[in-house]
């Protein structure tokens, strides 16, 4: 298979995603049955972190080990990347000493430049612009609980951040709808709105209307990493964009709730929702592990049939 990266959700087409979701299901079944599956023996994943993480590091490191490979952790503070080495040079060296690379950083441009100079697949573990692995896990979680997401409606409540951007990309690829409701001043950037078009998403000023009849309601923290100086201002601005029991009732009894975590109970979501019967956040978090295993398998081995 030709070298392929996963830097944005739409780097994979619907057929490739269907394969990855099916492989995720099988890989998860093997994991739950304590069945060893080591297709990546002697393969090495290098994980480069500029942004701190719990779930991203744990899911990639454990996932690579569970597939029989090994994972090496680098952060920019302790490597030459943090001392001014050009990204292009680092990519040349790191990709000669590894089989696959995951990067969690601030600017999408950094990961794009790294991938352009890499000999091995590069995965976006998160940037300010996109969070594709999270949406892979979210959609797989929806499929587990409700079946195909095609034609369904996802309500995004809160900041139009990297997770929101990735939902918009996913809607185009997999043919579902996204309702976006943000406070004034936090809307989807016009250039992104033009990029994604309006066939699969609609913006709402009223968050309750965005959630009405939705199949999935999802949100994220009001203040993402890098915006801590705006925390108090954002708490005021986002006050009415909280997912609570009333919003879930408007969505409907079969609607699911998701959150990429970590969550701030009492801010973007109430405790009774995130800990309630419609919440699937713990399955969603676990599925980062399994869907990323399927992703790494695909990027390194192509379409495996077992």
UniProtKB/Swiss-Prot annotation:
Q: What SUPFAM superfamilies has UniProt attached to this entry?
A: Aspartate/ornithine carbamoyltransferase
Reactions it catalyzes: carbamoyl phosphate + L-ornithine = L-citrulline + phosphate + H(+)
**Enzyme class, UniProt record, top EC level:** transferase
Q: Which is a Pfam family this sequence falls into? A: OTCace_N
The record's section on PROSITE patterns has: CARBAMOYLTRANSFERASE (PS00097)
GO biological process, alphabetically ordered: arginine biosynthetic process via ornithine; citrulline biosynthetic process; L-arginine biosynthetic process
Q: Which Gene Ontology CC terms are recorded?
A: cytoplasm
Look up keyword Ubl conjugation and say if it applies.
no
The record's function comment reads: Reversibly catalyzes the transfer of the carbamoyl group from carbamoyl phosphate (CP) to the N(epsilon) atom of ornithine (ORN) to produce L-citrulline.
Question: Per its record, how is this protein called by name?
Answer: Ornithine carbamoyltransferase
Protein's organism = Methylobacillus flagellatus (strain ATCC 51484 / DSM 6875 / VKM B-1610 / KT)
């Amino acid at each position: 298979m030709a070298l392929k990266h996963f830097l944005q959700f739409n780097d994979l087409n619907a057929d490739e995603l269907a394969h990855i979701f099916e492989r995720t299901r099988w890989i998860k079944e093997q994991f739950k049955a304590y069945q060893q599956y080591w297709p990546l023996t002697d393969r090495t994943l290098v994980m480069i972190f500029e942004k701190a993480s719990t779930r991203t590091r744990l899911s990639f490191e454990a996932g690579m080990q569970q597939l029989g490979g090994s994972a090496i952790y680098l952060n920019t503070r302790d490597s030459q990347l943090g001392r001014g080495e050009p990204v292009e040079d680092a990519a040349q060296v790191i990709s000669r000493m590894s089989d696959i690379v995951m990067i969690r950083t601030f600017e999408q441009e950094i990961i794009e430049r790294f991938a352009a100079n890499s000999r091995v697949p590069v995965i976006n573990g998160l940037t300010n612009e996109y969070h594709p692995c999270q949406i892979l896990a979210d959609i797989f979680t929806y499929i587990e609980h409700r079946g195909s997401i095609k034609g369904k409606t996802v309500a995004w409540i809160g900041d139009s951040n990297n997770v929101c951007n990735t939902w918009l990309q996913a809607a185009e690829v997999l043919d579902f709808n996204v309702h976006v409701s943000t406070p004034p001043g936090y809307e989807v950037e016009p250039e992104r709105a033009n990029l994604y078009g309006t066939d699969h998403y609609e913006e709402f000023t009223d968050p309750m209307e965005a959630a009405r009849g939705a199949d999935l309601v999802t949100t994220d923290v009001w203040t993402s990493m890098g915006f801590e100086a705006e925390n108090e201002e954002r708490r005021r601005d986002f006050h009415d964009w909280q997912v609570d029991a009333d919003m879930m009732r408007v969505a409907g009894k079969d609607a699911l709730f998701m959150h990429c975590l970590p969550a701030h109970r009492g801010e973007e979501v109430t405790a009774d929702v995130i800990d309630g019967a419609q919440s699937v956040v713990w399955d969603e978090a676990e599925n980062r592990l399994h869907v990323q295993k399927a992703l790494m398998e695909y990027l390194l081995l192509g379409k495996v049939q077992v």
